[in-house]
């Protein structure tokens, strides 16, 4: 993870909005998607870029 990946991740307004939303606490991809007019695939794409840049991390809950 370098500066290039971080700046790329932060260059998109939707990704900045996702980060702002996540400041409130942990959320699932579905919960994040409920706040935006985007498909689940688009939310996943943005989250992948944010994860690659080290700006968010993923945890999985056992059911």
Where in this protein do the model-derived segments appear?
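Hydrophobic alpha-helical segments, especially transmembrane helices
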Residues: 16-17, 47-49
């Amino acid at each position: 993870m370098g500066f290039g990946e971080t700046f790329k991740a932060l260059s998109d307004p939707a990704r900045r909005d996702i980060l702002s939303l996540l400041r409130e606490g942990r959320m699932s991809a579905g919960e994040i998607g409920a706040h935006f007019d985007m498909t689940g695939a688009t939310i996943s794409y943005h989250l992948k870029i944010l994860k690659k840049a080290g700006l968010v991390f993923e945890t999985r809950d056992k059911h």
